[in-house]
Amino acid sequence: MTDTIKIGVGGPVGAGKTQLIEKIVKRLAKDMSIGVITNDIYTKEDEKILVNSGVLPEDRIIGVETGGCPHTAIREDASMNFAAIDELKERNDDIELIFIESGGDNLAATFSPELVDFSIYIIDVAQGEKIPRKGGQGMIKSDFFVINKTDLAPYVGASLDRMAEDTKVFRGNRPFTFTNLKTDEGLDEVIQWIEQDVFLKGLA
């Protein structure tokens, strides 16, 4: 069975987690065997969105209904997600990469290191310029940080320069990028991180 890398994607409700995964998978799936696990509290809405997008066959997408606090299912008791990983591998024994999308949660949510190998945390500009200044373990500890919906900055009075400065304070040299996933702006940086830092490509 192929060794499988697992990337967790976390962030508040509406930040763009599902859309980010959809965009990444669309770019990588032609060269890589991929699966996706989504977490929702009482529905499988994000699973339906990905299935309807057509980026992957339906048997490569599993929706998990956590039935409780979203971060519990990705950290304190990740048993449902571990079971979903096993099921994806049974369905497709060639899977190289699995994305695990958390349910929308607060800035403190992080993935168990036993569940994922790497993590992405995404927020959006519309939540306010001050969000990076608030810190939060999701933003601080993630391997890659995404600030989405840059096109909304003028409408909410947010300075992207200030958000970048604040992000550098708590992340140091760890990577982050701005995105507008409606136009794919910034998506190349996310893909490059996956290919080079996660899969160690392009380092020869």
Curated annotation (Swiss-Prot):
It comes from the Bacteria. GO terms for molecular function: GTP binding; GTPase activity; nickel cation binding. Keywords: Chaperone, Cytoplasm, GTP-binding, Nickel insertion, Nucleotide-binding. One of its GO terms (biological process) is urea catabolic process. It is found in: Cytoplasm. One of its GO terms (cellular component) is cytoplasm. Belongs to the SIMIBI class G3E GTPase family. UreG subfamily. PANTHER family: UREASE ACCESSORY PROTEIN G (PTHR31715:SF0). Facilitates the functional incorporation of the urease nickel metallocenter. This process requires GTP hydrolysis, probably effectuated by UreG. HAMAP family: UreG. Homodimer. UreD, UreF and UreG form a complex that acts as a GTP-hydrolysis-dependent molecular chaperone, activating the urease apoprotein by helping to assemble the nickel containing metallocenter of UreC. The UreE protein probably delivers the nickel. This is Urease accessory protein UreG.
